[in-house]
Amino acid sequence: MRLKNWAPALLFLGLFFFYPLVKILALGVDSPEFLAPESLKIAADSLGFTLWQALLSMLLTLLIGLPAAYLFARYDFRGKTLLRALTAVPFMLPTVVVAAGFNALLGARGWLNLTLMNLLNLETPPITVLYTLGAILLAHVFYNTTIVIRVVGNALSRLDPRLNEAARILGGNRWKAFWQVTFPLLRPSIFAAALLVFLFDFTSFGVILLLGGPSFATIEVEIYIQTLSMLNLPVAALLSIIQLLCTLAFSILYSRML
C-alpha cells in the first residue's frame, strides 16, 4: 500500500531527474576527455578550493557561533528570545536576497563605502569586499552561525550546571572547569555542528557565484561553468561524481555522529 502511494512520485523522479542525470553522466564518462590530464587538473583545483573555503568558513562560524551558543544557553537578558529567533532569519533567506544585501552594504557604491567616502572626502571606494574570498566567508558565517547556536546551545542547556560548580569546589577555576568538564560533554555536538556547517559550505553554490564570481570556482560553480559556458560535459560529469561521492561521505559521517 505504501509503495503504491509513492509510485507516482518515484516515477516522476525517475523519468524527469534520474534518467536525464544518468544519460548526461554517461555522455561524459564515455568521452576520452573524462580522465584527461586537463580534466583531472580542473577537478583537483576546484576540489582543493572547495575544501579550503569550506574549512575556513567552518572555523570562522565556530569562532562566532560557540560564544553565542554559550551566551544564549547560560545567560538570561532582555530580548533574548527575540534575538535568538532573529539569528535563524539568515538561514531562511534566498541567496539572491543575501547577495543583494551584501552589495547594498559592502559594494563599491554600498552604504559603508559611500559613508566613508563622504566622511574622508575620498573619490574611490576605500573597501573592496565583493568578489573576494572574504565576501564568501562572511556570507557563509552569516548563513550558518545559527546552526552552531542551536545544535551546541541545545546540548549546553541540557547539561547540569552543578557539574561545573562541583569542579570549581574541587579547586578548579571557571576556565579549567569548562575545559575539563563542559567541553568533553559538548564535544559530540560541536563536531556534529562543525560537520553540518562544513557540508553546507562544501555544497554552496549561489553565495560563491554571486559574491565571489567565476574566479572562485568551487566544484558546484565549476560544474555550472563547464556545463553552460564551456559545454564540456566530460569535465562536468567528472566533477559531479566527485561532488556526489564527497557529499555522500560527509553525510554518512554526520549520521554516524548523531
Q: For each of these PLM feature ranges, what is it?
A:
Residues 36-37, 155-156, 180, 210-213, ...:
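Short alpha-helical segment immediately N-terminal to, or the first helix within
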Residues 1-32, 41-157, 185-206, 210-212, ...:
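Membrane-water interface segments at the C-terminal ends of transmembrane alpha-helices
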Residues 34, 161, 176, 214-220, ...:
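Feature of multi-pass inner-membrane transport and sensor proteins
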Residues 144-148, 162, 219:
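N-terminal positioning helix adjacent to the helix-turn-helix/winged-helix DNA-binding module
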